[in-house]
Amino acid sequence: MRKIKIVADSSCDLFELTHTEFETAPMKIITAEREFVDDANLDVDGMADYLYQLKGKSKSSCPNTTDWLDAFGDADEIFCVTITSGLSGSYNSACAAKQIYEAEKEGKRVHVFDTLSAGPEITLIIEKIEECIDKDMSFEDICDCVTAYMKKTGLVFMLKSLKTFANNGRVSPIVAKLVGIAGICIVGKASDEGTLEPMHKPRGERRALETLTGCLEAEGFKFGRISIGHCQNESAAEQLKELILAKFKNVSIEIH
């Protein structure tokens, strides 16, 4: 009997699955004084509060090849899922680990999916892989089915703060501060190339959530599964769920 495993970097918002062996390779956030490892033991609230107060710089670090090999374990067939290669080196590290694993373990196979996305969309992709495994599909058929599924999924997002982006040098600290003072939210989507593309700058959380719901329709969503991810904002996630349920029929929504 083949031993099957799903492995993902920790951007996926999951740490366990119901029916399939699953493991994450942790992302990290590093400052001059501290290192945060994104695993099941991470105090997310404590980390977020620390980074919000941080005056210095921070940087993120993707799993390295050794991290991926450790996560692979000794499975016969591995389905590996990474955050978009447009934002991180996670995919390249996973591909390097795949080459080493398959070279050292004859007959064992790894497929690496570059999601070209982040967060909740990765969750949907992982759940699709598990669904295919439950149907006892072959390795090749699972790869084909999930690749086709990824062409039908998408990501839209809302950011209330640009503080972390300022800390790691992606945006000007002045811009981040002005956005916060003005109460502006950034609403955008994951592009086909795997970058995060800002589209709207509504003022106020409620208007931003309404804009986000409108983006779903603009991106062609009509019915099906939606995964909502959030950081320290469960109330906004619940409001978004209500807005979506009011606008669309035949929708199944999970909040992570």
Regions found by a protein language model. Give the residues of each.
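Mixed-charge interfacial surface used for oligomerization/domain docking
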Residues: 2-3, 11-19, 23-28, 33, ...
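A generic structural signal for ordered secondary structure
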Residues: 69, 112-113
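Short beta-strand segments
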Residues: 7-8, 82-84, 114
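Short, solvent-exposed loop/turn segments that connect beta-strands within catalytic domains
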Residues: 105-107
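Class I S-adenosyl-L-methionine
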Residues: 34-103
